Amino acid sequence: MNIAVAGIGYVGLSCAVLLSTHHSVRSFDITQSRVDLINAGKSPIRDVEIEDALAAGTRINASTDPQEAFTGADWVVIATPTNYDPDKNYFDTSSVEQVLRQVQTINPDATIVVKSTVPVGYVEGLTSEFPKLSILFSPEFLREGNALRDNLHPSRVVVGF
């Protein structure tokens, strides 16, 4: 199975490392320095278990090119930042929507899993905006510095659409 992960921060990178134990993973990020570190087997975040896994070797290739990352993927995990804007009292979900537009153009048959922090009901709205895409939501419950461990030993599992 081919999996693409958009966003290689704590959430995306821990997912990519975990999934790469059994699958080929292509990570996508807009920051070249993060991509370069991943491709060199180094972590752009502080997490000992992720650092160790990358140093030992994984089946992760990273790119800043969405075409390269999303083409042929069976699944696309979206873990892009959605910073909270206190002035608007809302999360900035533009990065999630940008990835969805890219996947819709490049690989509309992929199943998409949104891991980014989004408002309640947000994914339901996406299904009307992107009716041809199969979109699921699986919230993350990770602690910085323990992201891989928390993915391996979750306190709870929630998935919805």
Q: Which residues does each predicted region cover?
A:
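Glycine-rich Rossmann-fold phosphate-binding loop(s) that bind the pyrophosphate
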Residues: 8
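Aromatic pocket-lining residues of Rossmann-like dinucleotide-binding sites
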Residues: 19
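Redox-cofactor binding/interface segments in oxidoreductases and associated redox assembly factors
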Residues: 76-78, 114, 159
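Short beta-strand and adjoining strand-loop segment in the mid-core
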Residues: 117, 148-161
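N-terminal Rossmann-fold NAD(P) dinucleotide-binding loop
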Residues: 12-13
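Rossmann-like NAD(P)(H) cofactor-binding subdomain of soluble oxidoreductases
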Residues: 84-146
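Conserved N-terminal Rossmann-fold NAD(P) cofactor-binding segment
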Residues: 2, 24, 30-75, 82-90
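Conserved hydrophobic helix-helix packing surfaces used for dimerization/oligomerization
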Residues: 3-5, 112, 157
